[in-house]
Amino acid sequence: MKFIVIKIGGSTLSDMHPSIINNIKHLRSNNIYPIIVHGGGPFINEALSNQQIEPHFVNGLRVTDKATMTITKHTLIADVNTALVAQFNQHQCSAIGLCGLDAQLFEITSFDQQYGYVGVPTALNKDALQYLCTKFVPIINSIGFNNHDGEFYNINADTLAYFIASSLKAPIYVLSNIAGVLINDVVIPQLPLVDIHQYIEHGDIYGGMIPKVLDAKNAIENGCPKVIIASGNKPNIIESIYNNDFVGTTILNS
Protein backbone atom coordinates (compact mmCIF):
# COMPACT_ATOMS: atom_id res chain seq x y z
CA MET A 1 0.00 0.00 0.00
CA LYS A 2 1.17 3.50 -0.87
CA PHE A 3 0.38 6.21 1.68
CA ILE A 4 0.63 9.98 1.76
CA VAL A 5 0.31 11.79 5.08
CA ILE A 6 -1.32 15.21 4.75
CA LYS A 7 -1.01 17.51 7.73
CA ILE A 8 -3.51 20.37 7.71
CA GLY A 9 -2.64 23.20 10.07
CA GLY A 10 -5.22 24.73 12.35
CA SER A 11 -4.74 28.10 10.66
CA THR A 12 -5.69 26.52 7.31
CA LEU A 13 -8.82 24.61 8.36
CA SER A 14 -11.18 27.58 8.20
CA ASP A 15 -9.78 28.63 4.80
CA MET A 16 -8.97 25.24 3.27
CA HIS A 17 -9.34 25.24 -0.51
CA PRO A 18 -12.25 22.98 -1.54
CA SER A 19 -10.12 21.31 -4.24
CA ILE A 20 -8.18 19.53 -1.47
CA ILE A 21 -11.00 17.03 -1.01
CA ASN A 22 -11.32 16.41 -4.76
CA ASN A 23 -7.55 15.89 -4.98
CA ILE A 24 -7.75 13.35 -2.15
CA LYS A 25 -10.58 11.50 -3.91
CA HIS A 26 -8.41 11.37 -7.04
CA LEU A 27 -5.49 9.90 -5.09
CA ARG A 28 -7.73 7.15 -3.70
CA SER A 29 -9.00 6.32 -7.18
CA ASN A 30 -5.36 5.65 -8.09
CA ASN A 31 -4.84 3.30 -5.11
CA ILE A 32 -2.90 5.86 -3.08
CA TYR A 33 -4.13 6.15 0.49
CA PRO A 34 -4.15 9.65 2.04
CA ILE A 35 -4.05 10.00 5.82
CA ILE A 36 -5.11 13.38 7.21
CA VAL A 37 -3.67 14.74 10.47
CA HIS A 38 -4.96 18.09 11.72
CA GLY A 39 -4.28 20.60 14.43
CA GLY A 40 -6.61 23.26 15.74
CA GLY A 41 -4.62 25.89 17.62
CA PRO A 42 -6.82 28.90 16.75
CA PHE A 43 -9.99 26.98 17.68
CA ILE A 44 -8.46 25.89 20.99
CA ASN A 45 -7.42 29.46 21.77
CA GLU A 46 -10.95 30.69 21.05
CA ALA A 47 -12.50 28.00 23.25
CA LEU A 48 -10.09 28.84 26.08
CA SER A 49 -10.84 32.54 25.70
CA ASN A 50 -14.56 31.82 26.02
CA GLN A 51 -13.77 30.25 29.41
CA GLN A 52 -11.45 33.14 30.41
CA ILE A 53 -8.40 30.84 30.30
CA GLU A 54 -5.19 32.43 29.02
CA PRO A 55 -3.12 30.16 26.69
CA HIS A 56 0.41 29.58 27.93
CA PHE A 57 3.32 28.40 25.79
CA VAL A 58 6.88 27.32 26.62
CA ASN A 59 9.32 26.98 23.71
CA GLY A 60 6.40 27.06 21.28
CA LEU A 61 4.53 24.18 22.94
CA ARG A 62 1.17 24.68 24.63
CA VAL A 63 1.25 24.11 28.40
CA THR A 64 -1.79 21.94 29.08
CA ASP A 65 -3.22 21.76 32.60
CA LYS A 66 -6.33 19.71 33.43
CA ALA A 67 -8.82 22.45 32.53
CA THR A 68 -7.00 23.23 29.28
CA MET A 69 -6.87 19.52 28.41
CA THR A 70 -10.63 19.13 28.88
CA ILE A 71 -11.33 22.05 26.56
CA THR A 72 -8.67 20.97 24.05
CA LYS A 73 -10.06 17.43 23.86
CA HIS A 74 -13.61 18.64 23.30
CA THR A 75 -12.54 21.23 20.73
CA LEU A 76 -10.38 18.91 18.62
CA ILE A 77 -12.61 15.83 18.76
CA ALA A 78 -16.18 17.15 18.99
CA ASP A 79 -15.79 20.39 17.03
CA VAL A 80 -12.85 20.47 14.62
CA ASN A 81 -12.57 16.77 13.74
CA THR A 82 -16.31 16.27 13.40
CA ALA A 83 -16.66 19.32 11.15
CA LEU A 84 -13.80 18.15 8.93
CA VAL A 85 -15.24 14.63 8.60
CA ALA A 86 -18.64 16.12 7.73
CA GLN A 87 -17.03 18.30 5.07
CA PHE A 88 -15.39 15.27 3.44
CA ASN A 89 -18.56 13.19 3.61
CA GLN A 90 -20.62 16.00 2.06
CA HIS A 91 -18.26 15.84 -0.93
CA GLN A 92 -18.81 12.07 -1.32
CA CYS A 93 -15.42 11.27 0.17
CA SER A 94 -16.05 8.78 2.98
CA ALA A 95 -14.00 9.77 6.00
CA ILE A 96 -13.64 8.58 9.57
CA GLY A 97 -12.59 10.73 12.52
CA LEU A 98 -10.02 9.27 14.88
CA CYS A 99 -8.01 10.07 17.98
CA GLY A 100 -5.30 7.93 19.53
CA LEU A 101 -7.81 6.05 21.68
CA ASP A 102 -9.82 4.80 18.69
CA ALA A 103 -8.72 1.29 17.64
CA GLN A 104 -5.72 1.95 19.92
CA LEU A 105 -4.37 3.85 16.93
CA PHE A 106 -1.22 5.17 18.56
CA GLU A 107 0.46 4.88 21.93
CA ILE A 108 1.87 7.87 23.75
CA THR A 109 3.95 8.82 26.73
CA SER A 110 4.13 12.04 28.73
CA PHE A 111 6.55 14.54 27.20
CA ASP A 112 7.71 16.66 30.15
CA GLN A 113 6.00 17.48 33.44
CA GLN A 114 6.46 21.23 32.94
CA TYR A 115 4.06 21.03 29.97
CA GLY A 116 1.32 19.17 31.84
CA TYR A 117 -0.85 16.91 29.69
CA VAL A 118 1.38 17.02 26.61
CA GLY A 119 2.35 13.69 25.09
CA VAL A 120 4.55 12.27 22.36
CA PRO A 121 3.67 9.27 20.17
CA THR A 122 5.70 6.11 20.74
CA ALA A 123 4.00 3.41 18.63
CA LEU A 124 1.56 3.25 15.72
CA ASN A 125 -1.05 0.54 15.18
CA LYS A 126 -0.20 0.05 11.51
CA ASP A 127 -2.57 -2.87 10.98
CA ALA A 128 -5.57 -0.88 12.18
CA LEU A 129 -4.62 2.20 10.18
CA GLN A 130 -3.98 0.23 7.00
CA TYR A 131 -7.35 -1.50 7.32
CA LEU A 132 -9.18 1.78 7.89
CA CYS A 133 -7.43 3.28 4.85
CA THR A 134 -9.00 0.64 2.61
CA LYS A 135 -12.49 1.78 3.67
CA PHE A 136 -12.20 5.48 4.53
CA VAL A 137 -10.00 8.55 4.56
CA PRO A 138 -8.70 8.61 8.16
CA ILE A 139 -8.86 12.09 9.66
CA ILE A 140 -6.75 12.02 12.80
CA ASN A 141 -6.74 14.66 15.52
CA SER A 142 -3.87 15.10 17.93
CA ILE A 143 -5.48 13.77 21.11
CA GLY A 144 -3.81 10.66 22.54
CA PHE A 145 -4.63 8.37 25.45
CA ASN A 146 -2.04 7.13 27.94
CA ASN A 147 -2.86 3.54 28.91
CA HIS A 148 -0.56 3.76 31.94
CA ASP A 149 -2.30 6.60 33.78
CA GLY A 150 -5.69 6.54 32.02
CA GLU A 151 -5.44 10.18 30.95
CA PHE A 152 -5.87 12.00 27.65
CA TYR A 153 -2.94 14.06 26.37
CA ASN A 154 -2.50 16.79 23.79
CA ILE A 155 0.11 16.10 21.11
CA ASN A 156 1.72 18.62 18.79
CA ALA A 157 -0.02 17.87 15.47
CA ASP A 158 3.18 18.31 13.44
CA THR A 159 4.97 15.83 15.70
CA LEU A 160 2.15 13.29 15.29
CA ALA A 161 1.99 13.70 11.51
CA TYR A 162 5.74 13.29 11.11
CA PHE A 163 5.67 10.23 13.38
CA ILE A 164 2.96 8.57 11.28
CA ALA A 165 4.83 9.37 8.05
CA SER A 166 8.08 7.92 9.42
CA SER A 167 6.32 4.80 10.71
CA LEU A 168 4.71 4.15 7.31
CA LYS A 169 7.76 5.34 5.34
CA ALA A 170 5.41 7.70 3.52
CA PRO A 171 5.92 11.23 2.20
CA ILE A 172 4.19 14.03 4.07
CA TYR A 173 2.56 17.20 2.75
CA VAL A 174 2.46 19.92 5.42
CA LEU A 175 -0.25 22.40 4.44
CA SER A 176 -0.52 25.66 6.34
CA ASN A 177 -0.95 29.38 5.72
CA ILE A 178 2.62 29.76 4.46
CA ALA A 179 3.85 29.04 0.94
CA GLY A 180 7.00 27.18 1.98
CA VAL A 181 10.39 27.78 3.60
CA LEU A 182 11.44 31.38 3.01
CA ILE A 183 15.08 32.37 2.55
CA ASN A 184 15.51 36.13 2.05
CA ASP A 185 11.73 36.38 1.61
CA VAL A 186 11.74 33.93 -1.31
CA VAL A 187 10.30 30.39 -1.16
CA ILE A 188 13.09 27.92 -1.89
CA PRO A 189 11.96 24.90 -3.95
CA GLN A 190 14.30 22.43 -2.23
CA LEU A 191 15.93 22.23 1.19
CA PRO A 192 18.52 19.45 1.59
CA LEU A 193 18.96 18.19 5.15
CA VAL A 194 22.64 19.17 5.12
CA ASP A 195 21.71 22.86 4.74
CA ILE A 196 19.19 23.11 7.57
CA HIS A 197 21.52 23.86 10.49
CA GLN A 198 23.47 26.39 8.44
CA TYR A 199 20.30 28.31 7.57
CA ILE A 200 19.23 28.27 11.24
CA GLU A 201 22.65 29.41 12.50
CA HIS A 202 22.69 32.30 10.01
CA GLY A 203 19.17 33.35 11.00
CA ASP A 204 17.70 32.63 7.57
CA ILE A 205 15.30 30.09 9.10
CA TYR A 206 13.82 31.44 12.33
CA GLY A 207 10.78 31.49 14.62
CA GLY A 208 8.08 28.90 14.14
CA MET A 209 9.75 27.51 11.02
CA ILE A 210 12.68 26.14 13.07
CA PRO A 211 10.72 23.33 14.79
CA LYS A 212 8.97 22.53 11.48
CA VAL A 213 12.22 21.92 9.58
CA LEU A 214 13.90 20.15 12.51
CA ASP A 215 10.89 17.82 12.86
CA ALA A 216 11.06 17.26 9.10
CA LYS A 217 14.75 16.40 9.37
CA ASN A 218 14.04 13.91 12.14
CA ALA A 219 11.19 12.35 10.14
CA ILE A 220 13.36 11.87 7.06
CA GLU A 221 16.15 10.36 9.14
CA ASN A 222 13.59 7.88 10.50
CA GLY A 223 12.07 6.66 7.23
CA CYS A 224 9.96 9.43 5.69
CA PRO A 225 11.23 9.88 2.10
CA LYS A 226 10.42 13.60 1.78
CA VAL A 227 8.54 16.48 3.38
CA ILE A 228 6.75 19.16 1.37
CA ILE A 229 5.74 22.41 3.08
CA ALA A 230 3.18 24.39 1.06
CA SER A 231 0.10 26.61 1.27
CA GLY A 232 -3.21 24.86 1.89
CA ASN A 233 -5.13 27.79 0.41
CA LYS A 234 -4.05 27.25 -3.21
CA PRO A 235 -6.28 25.38 -5.67
CA ASN A 236 -5.31 21.78 -6.45
CA ILE A 237 -2.29 22.01 -4.16
CA ILE A 238 -2.19 18.28 -3.40
CA GLU A 239 -2.38 17.36 -7.08
CA SER A 240 0.38 19.88 -7.86
CA ILE A 241 2.67 18.44 -5.18
CA TYR A 242 1.99 14.87 -6.28
CA ASN A 243 2.80 15.77 -9.91
CA ASN A 244 6.07 17.45 -8.84
CA ASP A 245 4.93 20.84 -10.10
CA PHE A 246 7.44 22.64 -7.87
CA VAL A 247 5.11 24.21 -5.35
CA GLY A 248 6.24 24.96 -1.83
CA THR A 249 9.49 23.60 -0.42
CA THR A 250 10.58 19.98 -0.64
CA ILE A 251 12.84 18.85 2.21
CA LEU A 252 14.81 15.74 1.33
CA ASN A 253 17.91 13.77 2.22
CA SER A 254 20.42 14.90 -0.38
UniProtKB/Swiss-Prot annotation:
Q: Which InterPro entries match?
A: AceGlu_kinase-like_sf (IPR036393), AcgluKinase_fam (IPR004662), ArgB (IPR037528), Asp/Glu/Uridylate_kinase (IPR001048)
The reaction(s) annotated as catalysed by this protein in its Swiss-Prot or TrEMBL entry are: N-acetyl-L-glutamate + ATP = N-acetyl-L-glutamyl 5-phosphate + ADP
**Cysteine pairs bridged by disulfides in the record:** none
Class of enzymatic activity (EC top level): transferase
Stated name of the protein: Acetylglutamate kinase
Q: Where does substrate bind?
A: G40, G41, R62, N154
Upper lineage: Bacteria, Bacillati, Bacillota, Bacilli, Bacillales
Give UniProt keywords alphabetically.
Amino-acid biosynthesis, Arginine biosynthesis, ATP-binding, Cytoplasm, Kinase, Nucleotide-binding, Transferase
Where does it live in the cell? Cytoplasm
User: What SUPFAM superfamilies does UniProt report for this protein, alphabetically?
Assistant: Carbamate kinase-like
The GO terms describing molecular function are:
acetylglutamate kinase activity; ATP binding
Annotated site location: Transition state stabilizer: K7, K212
